[in-house]
Amino acid sequence: TFCSCETKYMYDKIPVAEAKSLNIEDFQPCCTTPLYDAMGMTLTSTHKHVQDMMDAMVVVTIITDGLENASCEYNGKTIKELVERLRGEGWTFTYMGANQNSVEVAMSMSIRNARNFDYSNEGTRASMQKDSSTRMNLFGRLAKWKTAEMKGCCGVLASESERRNLYANMADEAFDEEENK
């Protein structure tokens, strides 16, 4: 979590199996919102960590209760450029904002998938459930594709670039399907 008074990492590059569930207390905002700095630092660090991994799928979810108002190192232009570059590498992004026009904010950063939520326990819970359903949908699609690929029904194996684009498209389709439920 990032705020103008501190940066607190809940998890930093640990296996999913070792991560514990987060609760509402883990997301208590304070101070102001250096959203661009939070994104820039996290995305840059994650990119360094995964850049040499083969067949990596990177799914980024940005959750915020506020708009950018305190960044020092990154600005809207640099974040938009970073997101566009990473999307070109197959990364997928979801922006979830409380009590704001999340679609407009996300679009300003070249993020396709956006979701609004009410800043309340129920609003947060519902948004997290929807995001979880989206991820499960995505991983179901990925499992089917991987199974078909292993059985050789897909013909020639996809190149790394094709694979990353396929993963990003699967993520977008999963998001759209869950939004339309």
Summary of predicted features, one role per range:
Residues T1-K181:
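Acidic, low-complexity intrinsically disordered regions
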